Amino acid sequence: MPAAIQQSQMESDKLSAIKTIDSEIRAIEELKKSLDAESLTKALDFMQNSTGRIIITGMGKSGHIGKKIAASLASTGTPSFFVHPAEASHGDLGMITDDDVVIAISNSGE
């Protein structure tokens, strides 16, 4: 590939990366604006003071994110696992106790 084309492709890739980062920054800023500090503090305190595990659930892309959150929590010492909502009623609900905290993730709100 000629050097000029390679340089042009690198510039295009760089611009694409910058646009992606800018988009992520805007999304995080919007998230920050929408947070209710009191509710967030209560939720974090509830999770921290729980004697059980953190159970994450979600369908589709929310489920993929939930799996990552559960894995990250578990790898940092917080007992956690993911329960797929479509399979929960087929035996997985039996793993959840009254002491556990369940976090349901949904983009649609359903």
Residue ranges: model-predicted function:
Residues 1-2, 68:
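N-terminal cationic amphipathic segment used for targeting or macromolecule association
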Residues 48, 52-110:
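Glycine-rich phosphate-binding loops that contact phosphosugars or nucleotide phosphates
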Residues 2, 10-50:
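An N-terminal, well-structured beta->alpha segment
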Residues 7:
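Cationic, low-complexity basic patches in intrinsically disordered or flexible, solvent-exposed regions
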